[in-house]
Amino acid sequence: MTYGTYRAKPARGKGRGDRRAGARGQVLALAAFSLIALCALVGLAADTGYFFDYKRKMQTAADAAALAGAEQLRRGGNGNGQIVNAADAAAASNGFTNNVSGTGIQVHIPPGSGYYTSDGSYVEAIITQTRPTLFMGILGLQSATVSARAVAGVQDSPNCIYALGQTGTGLATNGSGSSLSAACGIVVNSSAASALNAGSGAVFGTSVAVAGTYSGSCSSSEPSGCRTGVPPQPDPLAQLADPQFSGCDFGAPTPVNVSGGVVTLNPGTYCNGISIGSGASVTFQPGVYILNGGGLSVSGNSTIQGTGVTFYNTAQGKYSYGPVNLTGGTLGFLNAPTSGPTAGILFFQDRTIIPKSGKSSNVIAGSSNLNFTGTFYFPTTDLTFSGGGQVSANYTIFVARTITVGGNTTLSANFSSLQDGNPIKKVTLAE
């Protein structure tokens, strides 16, 4: 009997199944790894966005801290303590308080790094804080340190003439030949149509910014010329501290009246002011002259001179305010102090004085020839130059409610040669 050859069928299911199971395992492992990687990327993106936003907020706080410290420096803050306190307070108001929630704030004067490391007019603020991560903790990164740095400094303002009044004509030149020429910027705060009225005179500044509009000859070094519609600027000397005094050193009950002769006056409080006339020659010794009522009046071809002097014009108690009038051919040589609380300030009017029509205008007139070095600060009263006088100096700065130049008068303003720069300062971010 013949039997056929038997061939067994291969066991297909087991071998292929093992291979398929292995492949599925590899896919699952790859998928799991990819999912972890994707989660890590998502977590990294989320944490990066979170920390970027947080650093932006911290940078805002650092900027505010540096600016506040520099502003305190501009105001003459005594010692680093006041500057540090101002910077810390500004940072806290922006959500970052020193030694709270792991926040550290460092304030350096001068900055500890960067371009201004040797300049004591700059303040550096550094804020650091360690923050927990949102998602990166699954990869072992539990926290990250965020930091922000800013540097702000005190710089010279580019402006040296301010007409602060916000109504009517703030700056005017009246009469042919009258001019105001400033080797610096001019600011006119009035929003009136005739805020700057050059009339038949001329006004020039390196820049001219007018809240309202102007008429007549107005020019500047800027390509755009005299600018209009500019927002009003604050009083640039608002931080200047008023001199303190009590009682009367001179002039009570009778005002100090110098009529002729050669006289030397000493600093102190002059109740009822100072009046000089009849060709007198007066020398003011260095220091601060408090004019409590009565003001300062010089006339009759008199001569006045003084170096390192400041005149503070006020009216307290029973004394009535009087303006500053230099008229009648006065010949004057007056220089402001170069150091101390009133450095760079020649005339300083009490800000609380309320102007009265016809009684509060400060006048320099009558062919007076004056050489001044210092700042004329009359924030609430008017300042008028007229009568063909020539007013010039190494530097002069004018801040008044209104400023008028008339009667063939030439008025120059410049602070370029002043050793410590413009007494009017501004605070700006530098780094």
Segments and roles (model prediction):
Residues 164, 187-189, 199, 206, ...:
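Feature marks extracellular polysaccharide-active and adherence modules
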Residues 1-24, 29:
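N-terminal leader/signal peptides at the extreme start of proteins
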Residues 2-9, 13, 52, 56, ...:
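Short amphipathic secondary-structure patches
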Residues 171, 178-181, 194-197, 201-203, ...:
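Solenoid scaffold repeats with emphasis on beta-solenoid/beta-helix
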